[in-house]
Design a protein with these regions (language model features):
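An extended, acidic, His-containing surface patch that forms the Zn2+-binding/catalytic region
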Residues: 58, 97, 206-207, 265-343, ...
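Active-site metal-coordination/substrate-binding segment of hydrolases
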Residues: 98-169, 467
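N-terminal helical capping/dimerization or prosegment-like subdomains
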Residues: 2-116, 343, 347
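Active-site nucleophile and cofactor-binding loops and adjacent substrate-binding regions
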Residues: 78-81, 137-141, 418-425
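A common structural junction motif
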Residues: 109, 256, 260-261, 366-376
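A generic structural motif
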Residues: 139, 230-232, 350-358, 388
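Fold-level recognition of mixed alpha/beta catalytic cores in primary-metabolism enzymes, strongest
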Residues: 138-303, 313-320, 435, 457-465
Length: 486
């Protein structure tokens, strides 16, 4: 006679079967509907309130939630004038020893459509090829809400122990979460004391195992404007007399970045890499090898800055980087005349290591760029209003280490969990670490090879998402049954 599991312990096979079935019948259809809504984040759609797309996305997700057959589930949509809407839900625990709450976090706003979609695909029409679901906002981060609730429901369906759970799903993450402090102040009494934060809005090194994200970079930026003339001038007449605004701009950016290597110069943009993270990065590099750079759509003979996977992972997670993401004052090639242009303006985006103070770094960047302008030209750096600090995960408690390993082995054919630092930014994570200093953090996600979030052909790897959902369910069960601290 087989040994009976202790009371409240989830049966792994039943969890996997339930989650897989729910993905086919409930989750995937909801994510398809979400993709069809052009719920562009307010930073890219100043008229978002008039357009109503964010409200549509939030209302659709809330309507789905209200039909989920979970005992005691309560759903509310919070709104206030001028603020993005937010979904808050509560699910009572059952058979749990955990006194603290599990907090699920995610977002329903999206990056803009962008250019370059191929194969007849578009941002706002879902296409499923049997493995990947293409469309904007499916992987980043529309799947997270139904996946989180499905993980809880898998435990309820078999009477397994589950902790009290609350969910906060916002509509402004891609704009730096400007309204989240307000909503958390409103919700604090209802959230309660948090023992575990779950965020599914991050990445994975591959699709062969569960990946725990151990750090995120911060973000800041601004607009750099260089002006040399009031009006454009004949390039034959002015060239060699009037300095090129583009050349001046290059010199200014060289103050920040080594043009030969891409390394950033100011010390304020750097931090020490903890030895534990170096060791984990080496382990991830050994697992991934050439996949670290093979995940990108290289053109021609272009190659990565190095072929050392460990250095690339450290660059992405623990070192700063600079990108020019937009430009004004430069006409399209087809209409470019022989004119020495009066000005060049670019949008500068910086990603910063996890423990760097983003506001202080941005202030120093502005000082460096505006000091002693070449040729006395007009140089103005306008910093972005919203900055976001990075995040470094707290030390894992023994129960979480064991739960992660067991869940990965159960749901990924025996493969153990792996750990990785990610280069993206989730503004809320650092705030939650400060607000709940004793909480553990489960940051993971589906943004692995080929996901291409923010770019063309964004896609959700559905088989991985199903396994991630099952893994989350088993971890929640372990959290509910973990021994209370002495």
């Amino acid at each position: 006679m087989p040994e009976q599991a202790p009371a409240g312990v989830a049966e792994d096979g039943s969890v996997r079967e339930f989650c897989d079935a729910q993905w086919e019948t409930e989750v995937l259809p909801l994510v398809r509907r979400h993709i069809r809504v052009p719920a562009v984040s307010p930073a890219y759609d100043p008229d978002w309130e008039a357009h109503g797309h964010l409200d549509r996305a939030v209302d659709a997700a809330a309507a789905w939630l209200r039909n989920v057959p979970l005992p005691g589930l309560r759903v509310e949509v919070l709104r206030a004038p001028g603020r993005t809407p937010l979904i808050f839900f509560e699910i009572p625990g059952e058979g749990t020893q955990a006194q603290e709450t599990v907090l699920f976090y995610g977002h329903l706003d999206k990056q803009p459509e962008g250019d370059g979609w191929t194969g007849g695909r578009t941002a706002w029409e879902p296409v499923f090829d049997g493995t990947r679901l293409y469309g904007r906002g499916g992987a980043d981060d529309g799947y997270a809400l139904p996946a989180s609730v499905t993980a809880v429901r898998a435990l309820a369906e078999q009477g397994a122990a589950r902790p009290r759970c609350v969910g906060v799903f916002e509509a402004g993450e891609e704009s730096g979460s400007p309204d989240l402090d307000h909503w958390f102040a409103v919700l604090a009494p209802r959230i309660g004391e948090v023992g575990l934060v779950v965020c599914l809005d991050s990445g994975a090194g591959d699709y062969e195992r569960l990946w725990l994200v151990t750090s995120l970079r911060g973000a800041c930026g601004g607009t750099l404007d260089v002006r040399v003339l009031g009006d454009g001038a004949h390039s034959g007449d002015a060239g060699g007399v009037v300095p090129s605004s583009f050349r001046v701009l290059r010199r200014l950016l060289d103050r920040l970045e080594d043009g030969a290597t891409g390394a950033l110069r100011p010390d304020v943009l750097h931090c020490e890499v903890p030895e534990q993270r170096r060791a984990q990065t080496g382990e991830a590099a050994a697992l991934l090898g050439e996949q670290v750079w093979g995940r990108f759509d290289w053109y021609g003979n272009a190659s990565p800055v190095t072929r050392d996977p460990e250095e690339l992972l450290l660059n992405r997670a623990w070192r700063p980087s600079l990108e020019v993401t937009g430009a004004d004052g430069i006409p399209p090639v087809a209409s470019a005349g022989n004119v020495l242009r009066p000005h060049t303006r670019v949008k500068v985006s910086l990603r910063l290591p996890p423990t760097v103070d983003s506001a202080a770094a941005l202030a120093e960047v502005g000082r460096i760029l505006e000091a002693d302008p070449p040729y006395g030209t007009s140089v103005r750096f306008t910093p972005d209003r919203v900055v976001a600090d990075g995040w470094h995960a707290p030390v894992e408690q023994p129960w979480l280490r064991a739960a992660l390993s067991a869940a990965s082995r159960s749901c990924f054919d025996g493969a153990d969990v792996a750990r990785i630092g990610q280069g993206g930014t989730i503004p809320l994570m650092g705030k939650l670490t400060r607000q709940f200093p004793e909480a553990q953090f489960l940051a993971c996600g589906v943004l692995g090879p080929g996901a291409n979030a923010h770019g063309p052909n964004e896609s959700l790897h559905v088989p991985y998402a199903r396994r991630l959902t099952s893994s989350l369910s088993l971890i929640l069960n372990d959290y509910a049954l973990r021994p209370r601290p002495e």
